[in-house]
Amino acid sequence: MYGVVNLKRWLQTAATAVLAVGAIGVFGALLTVFAADGGVQVPVIMYHAVIDDSRRLGQYVVSPAELESDFAWLQRNGYTAVLSEDLIRYVEDGTPLPEKPVLITFDDGYYNNYLYAYPAARRYGMKFVLSPIGKCTDLYTAEPSESPYYAHCTWAMLREMQDSGIVEIGNHTYDLHSSDGARLGTRRLASESMEDYRAMLSADVRLAQEKAGQNLGRAPVLFAYPFGVVSEGEPEIIASLGFSVTLSCEARISTVTRDPESLLYLGRFLRPSGETSEAFFARTLGAV
C-alpha cells in the first residue's frame, strides 16, 4: 500500500514539474523528482547565545536583531521549522515532511535563549531544539539569575518552553562540556580503556536523561555532541542510551531517508554574528 501511495505522490509531483517548466525542461524536472524521492535535505542551523550588546557579539553570540532577521528570512522564503519527532515520523512511517524543512538548534541552554529566542520563535511561527548542559541547569535552578550574559535556564523555564509545543529539549551531556581540561567534551582519553570510557560516558549522559525525565516529564531523543567531538565507539554508546537523532558540528546539509541511521550525526551550520541573514543563508543553504 505504501508503495502505491508513493507512486501516486511521485506522479503528481512529476506532473506539477512538467507543467511548471514546459516540454523543454521536462527531462531535468523528472531528474529533480527522482533525486527528491531518495530522501529529504534537512539543513540544521546552530545557535548558542543571544545577547543585546555589540561588545559581546562573535562566532557564538548573535544579537536579538540578527536572530529575528533570520527567523523572518526563513518565514519569508517558505521554510518550516521541524523538530526531532517530525524527522522520526518521516523515517519510521513515511509521514511527509514540509516542502522546505529546517531544524533550528540552540546549544548549552542559556537564559538568553528563553529571553530572546523563545518569544521570537512564537512571533515568527518557528520551532527550535534547545540542548542544555545538565549541570548548569541544576546550578541555576538552585540559584537563579536573569543575567543575559552568563545565566542558564532553570528547569522551570525549560518545562515552560517544552510545554508550549514549539521547543524541544535535547541532551548536551550533564557535565562533559569542557574545553580547558584533559578531556575535550566527550572525547575518550588516551589512557582510558574502552570499558572505563563507556562507563564514564554512559553515567554522565544517563544522569542528564534522568534529570530531564524528573523535571520535564520526558527524556530527550536528541543528543548534541559537545564541540562536535566523537570518539571511536561513542556513537554506539549514545545509541544504546535511546537517542534517535544526534547532531554534529560539521558544516553540511544532511539528507534524511527512511534509514534510521540517516538521523545520526546530522550536519549543522554555525550562525555567527556580523553577517546578514541573506548572506548567511545564501552561503549555507544555497539552493535548498
For the regions a language model picked out, list residue spans one by one:
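Active-site environment of divalent metal-dependent phosphoester hydrolases
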Residues: 111-113, 176-178, 227-233, 253-256
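Extended hydrophobic/aromatic segments used for targeting, binding, or gating
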Residues: 235-272
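Alpha-helical scaffolding within the catalytic cores
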Residues: 87-90, 113-117, 145-165, 251-255
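N-terminal Lys/Arg-rich, disordered targeting/topogenic segments
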Residues: 1-9
